[in-house]
């Protein structure tokens, strides 16, 4: 029993070391391999092969990382719910990135709408208030720094009672006109962006 415990601990440490030193290798072991996705302005991300990429419009690219009940339906889009994913948005999406569809400004957060929006986590709830939780510069591949903002947000019911919390993370590259937006706190995304390439 003791020998099995030691072996399990050693195996766990080996996996941890591989994850910390080689994110791409960690993705491969989890999903059976990786693939490269070429996006705007030469930005290329290495992602697990199990992830789907919806590229119907180059300014609204969605990388689906898990369950997505709206995929393949007419509800699929930026204002849907329950779709584990992140977005890579371009100039057309940025032109309507704020309330009342004004141009995006990173200090306010991306939220194109003129009315109450559906909560990204549940179609039974609505977006509530959000507050800035973190900001700074983050590496997105060699030679590129993104203007990073993390917003602590809520989802509320019809009586405006808070029912759940989520974070909206944004990496904005103003020169390339690219915004990476994540509402699911995907644990691998920061490393994927840091290890991005530009061609």
Regions found by a protein language model. Give the residues of each.
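Cleaved targeting-peptide boundary
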Residues: 27-37
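Residues that flank catalytic or metal-binding motifs in active/ligand-binding sites
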Residues: 47, 167, 192
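Residue-level detector of beta-strand structural context in well-folded domains
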Residues: 34-36, 43, 169
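Surface-exposed amphipathic alpha-helical segments
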Residues: 51, 173-199
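Secretory targeting and sorting signals
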Residues: 1-28
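Proline-anchored loop/turn motifs at beta-strand termini and strand-loop-strand connectors
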Residues: 40-59
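Conserved polar/disulfide-associated segments of primarily extracytoplasmic proteins
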Residues: 58-176, 183
């Amino acid at each position: 029993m003791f020998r099995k415990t030691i072996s399990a601990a050693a195996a766990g440490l080996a996996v941890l070391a591989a994850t910390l030193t080689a994110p791409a290798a960690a993705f491969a072991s989890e999903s059976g391999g990786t693939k490269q996705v070429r996006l705007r302005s030469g930005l290329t991300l290495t992602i697990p092969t199990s992830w789907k990429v919806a590229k119907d419009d180059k300014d609204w690219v969605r990388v689906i990382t898990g369950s997505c009940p709206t995929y393949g339906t007419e509800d699929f889009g930026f204002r849907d719910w329950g779709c584990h994913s992140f977005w890579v948005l371009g100039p057309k999406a940025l032109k309507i990135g704020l309330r009342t569809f004004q141009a995006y400004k990173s200090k306010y957060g991306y939220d194109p709408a003129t009315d109450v929006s559906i909560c990204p986590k549940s179609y039974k709830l609505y977006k509530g208030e959000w507050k800035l939780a973190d900001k700074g510069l983050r590496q997105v591949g060699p030679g590129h720094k993104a203007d990073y903002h993390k917003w602590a947000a809520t989802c509320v019911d019809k009586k405006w009672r808070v029912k759940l919390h989520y974070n909206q993370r944004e990496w904005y590259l103003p020169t390339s006109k690219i915004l990476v937006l994540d509402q699911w706190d995907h644990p691998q995304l920061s490393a994927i962006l840091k290890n991005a390439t530009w061609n």
